[in-house]
Structure formats: C-alpha cells, structure tokens
Amino acid sequence: GSMPFDARLLRRWHLYRFCTNGIAGLWLPHYADLVCMLTGTKYPTRGVAMGGNYVWEDGREHSDTFHTIMEYPEGFLFDFAMSLGNAGGTHFTIHGTNATLDMDKWTITPEGGTKDKPAEPRKIGSEPVATHMANWLQCIRSRQLPVCDIQIGQQQTVAVVISALAHDTGLRHRYEAAGRKVVPG
C-alpha cells in the first residue's frame, strides 16, 4: 500500500525496518564473505545476537549497537560487533591456533598461537583485484560467473538471517542445510 511522504527516507532509509534489517543486513555480509573466503567455510550452523539503541535517539527502528557470534561446522566462531556511536574504525583479525592474521595492518604474527608451531611474523600484501562492480559488469558482457556469485551471496544471507532473527527474537537460531531453513534452536 501507499504511505505518506517522509523526507527522512531520502537519506536515512537504512533506519527503517521496511527497507533493511539494520546492521546485520547492511554491514555483516561484507565480513561474513571474508570469513568464507579466508577459511573456505560456507554456512554457519548456529548463532546468537544482541544489541540495542544505546546512542542515537533519532527514531530509528534498528539497533545502533549490534553483536553476533556464529559457529561454523569446521570448529570456529565468527564474532562480529559494530557500534554506530563510536568512530574508532574497523578491526578485522583472525585468531588461529598458530598465528593471528590482522587484516587492518596486513600482518601475520605468532601472537596467541601455540608455542610448538609459531608462525613467522611477516607483512603480507594484498593482490590487486578488480572491484566487485567492474567484475560484475565484465561478467554481464562475457556471461561468466562473477567472483561473488549467487551461491556466495546465499551463504552470506544465511549468516545475516541467523543474526537478524537471533537479535530480533532473543533466541539462538540455527541453519538446517537439508531444508535450507533458519529456525530457532
């Protein structure tokens, strides 16, 4: 149905439930994608989330602070947190059993790893790659699959849905791969 004009929707659409599911849908997919790319995993098995409006009093329908933890079948947790009330920047690290990978500094260090197989500290470089948009447009022309195809998008969506539902209901949610469903539990 129709609704009355609201000028706030022109620039602040992301604050409303009928447009998005908040931080889980706007920011989490980028990091869930990185987790899949770097570890080779596909879908989280279950997750929890919480958050709330602790900073902004502007009529938003979504939390300004969000935290989710998801478990993956390979035996690790993905912990994502974001606060829109702090400009401290992003921090993305992977804490493995032999090393810590700091994606902000592009370094690998033995910090936090085991003593019997410590990683050699080193700086890593990113490989130059085309942007997602350039890759997508090239694939439209060539009829090839893009780097992030629909299957990868679906993997990210499962992480988003688990987290958003867990946040909204206060219940842990899990992914049933056989039926491709996210359910409480």
Task: Locate the predicted segments by residue.
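Acidic/polar loop patches that form or flank catalytic/metal-binding clefts of enzymes
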Residues: 41-49, 77-80, 101-104, 145-149, ...
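Generic alpha-helical secondary structure signal
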Residues: 8, 128-135
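Non-transmembrane alpha-helical segments in soluble domains
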Residues: 32-36, 69, 133-141, 154-157, ...
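Active-site-proximal structural scaffolding
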Residues: 27-28, 40, 61-63, 87, ...
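Tryptophan-centric aromatic hotspots in well-structured domains and transmembrane helices
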Residues: 13, 27, 31, 35-37, ...
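Predominantly a Rossmann-like dinucleotide-binding segment in NAD(P)-dependent oxidoreductases
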Residues: 1-48, 53-59, 90-92, 123, ...
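C-terminal helix-rich "cap/oligomerization" subdomain common to oxidoreductases
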Residues: 58-61, 139-185
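NAD(P)-dinucleotide binding in Rossmann-like oxidoreductases
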Residues: 58-60, 64-66, 71-131
